[in-house]
């Protein structure tokens, strides 16, 4: 199915919505519904900007986003959101002229994207096409490296969750953001999606360590959307059994607790649950 043409009106609307969220958050540490709304606005923006793929004002758009984000006084959230924008959508750092040369790349999705924007782009030389192929390959390699870095970041957060200067609630919040960021990294990069099975065990491991049911259901939904029914069904079955055992240690959740679960598939889950 062909991708829709770039809707600049929707893009402007999404940027405006994000700016409004940021403006209303000035002087406030984003929590609860406010942080959720903030993230929803970014996700809507992320759903539009990949269609720009490597240009059509991508650099200018990134500058606008950074300027808007700078209005927030929450350094933690600013850092999370800037990381999300600059790392999860690396195509925005490419030059516009490189997009047309993606015609030469054997990638169906790229081909469809370029079909929707090629009439806006100047012609490029054979040398530029060759350079793009090399840079595109390096970009994907760098993105895989960032995914591994994100998993290492989760490990560090888990290791530091009991430090004296950080509350359990704050640690859990940061972990959930990091895990969602990892999932988005897989979701928005088509190259990652084709090879996601190789990193799925690692991603599930971090979900298991966190033990956060709604995040796991989101991953089940994501798998179903990508037609990975076998993995989605297995994950759903394990999650159902996991939830059945939840009441056994539910009274301890207010302060957090260790858990050890044995699933029918033979998988053993253990970790520390944050409420």
Each language-model region and where it sits:
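Function-determining surface determinants
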Residues: 1-275
């Amino acid at each position: 199915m062909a991708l829709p043409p770039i809707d600049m009106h929707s893009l402007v609307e999404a940027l405006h919505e994000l700016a409004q969220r940021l403006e209303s958050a000035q002087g406030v540490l984003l929590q609860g519904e406010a942080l959720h709304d903030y993230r929803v606005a970014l996700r809507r923006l992320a759903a539009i900007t990949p269609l720009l793929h490597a240009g059509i004002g991508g650099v200018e758009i990134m500058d606008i986003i950074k300027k808007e984000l700078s209005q927030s006084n929450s350094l933690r959230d600013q850092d999370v959101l800037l990381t999300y924008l600059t790392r999860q959508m690396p195509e925005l750092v490419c030059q516009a002229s490189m997009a047309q040369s993606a015609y030469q790349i054997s990638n169906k999705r790229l081909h469809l994207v370029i079909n929707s924007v090629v009439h806006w782009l100047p012609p490029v030389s054979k040398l530029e096409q060759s350079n793009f192929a090399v840079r595109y390959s390096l970009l994907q390699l760098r993105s895989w490296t960032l995914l591994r870095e994100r998993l290492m970041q989760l490990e560090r957060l888990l290791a530091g969750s009991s430090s004296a200067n950080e509350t359990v609630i704050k640690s859990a919040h940061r972990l959930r953001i990091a895990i969602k960021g990892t999932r988005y990294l897989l979701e928005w990069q088509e190259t990652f999606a084709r090879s996601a099975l190789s990193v799925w065990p690692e991603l599930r491991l971090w979900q298991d360590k966190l033990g956060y049911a709604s995040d796991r259901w989101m991953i089940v939904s994501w798998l179903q959307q990508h037609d990975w029914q076998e993995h989605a069904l297995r994950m759903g079955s394990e999650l159902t059994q996991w939830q059945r055992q939840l009441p056994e240690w539910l009274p301890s959740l207010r302060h957090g607790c260790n858990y050890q679960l044995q699933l029918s598939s033979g998988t053993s889950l253990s970790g520390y649950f944050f409420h």
